[in-house]
């Protein structure tokens, strides 16, 4: 079984990654040298633990965003995704089919004046079998 990492190791690794992300990689030995240069770490054992966790987090970051670590590149990508505007608006279609409930919601949101709305009756849900022994 693996060892439990202390909050000192985790916090130090997160701070190092946020500040020096561009200098770090997936190699433990280069991360160890970077940690040695940028931080005053009292012991060799602690330095190696921090460098190991930095390497672990760097591998996780490559797969996707990691909770608790804010990197400018990831922030910009998230901002770009949030501000996405489609080429053609969904409201520019010739006929938009909606059910009566959706029509009511659009009316409450002041979209009731859309001329291309066509109210259709909702389709009946799946025909589920009755549970065994219910008859």
Curated annotation (Swiss-Prot):
Swiss-Prot/TrEMBL GO biological process terms: ribosomal small subunit biogenesis; translation
The entry's keywords: Cytoplasm, Nucleus, Ribonucleoprotein, Ribosomal protein
Protein origin, superkingdom: Eukaryota
Any one GO molecular function term: structural constituent of ribosome
GO cellular component terms, semicolon-separated: cytosolic ribosome; nucleolus; small-subunit processome
Places the protein is found: Cytoplasm; Nucleus, Nucleolus
NCBIfam families hit by this protein: PRK01151.1
Self-association state and partner proteins as the record states: Component of the small ribosomal subunit. Part of the small subunit (SSU) processome, composed of more than 70 proteins and the RNA chaperone small nucleolar RNA (snoRNA) U3.
Listed PANTHER family: 40S RIBOSOMAL PROTEIN S17 (PTHR10732:SF0)
Annotated family: Belongs to the eukaryotic ribosomal protein eS17 family.
Task performed by this protein: Component of the small ribosomal subunit. The ribosome is a large ribonucleoprotein complex responsible for the synthesis of proteins in the cell. Part of the small subunit (SSU) processome, first precursor of the small eukaryotic ribosomal subunit. During the assembly of the SSU processome in the nucleolus, many ribosome biogenesis factors, an RNA chaperone and ribosomal proteins associate with the nascent pre-rRNA and work in concert to generate RNA folding, modifications, rearrangements and cleavage as well as targeted degradation of pre-ribosomal RNA by the RNA exosome.
Protein name (record): Small ribosomal subunit protein eS17
Species assigned in the record: Gallus gallus
Lineage, broadest ranks: Eukaryota, Metazoa, Chordata, Craniata, Vertebrata
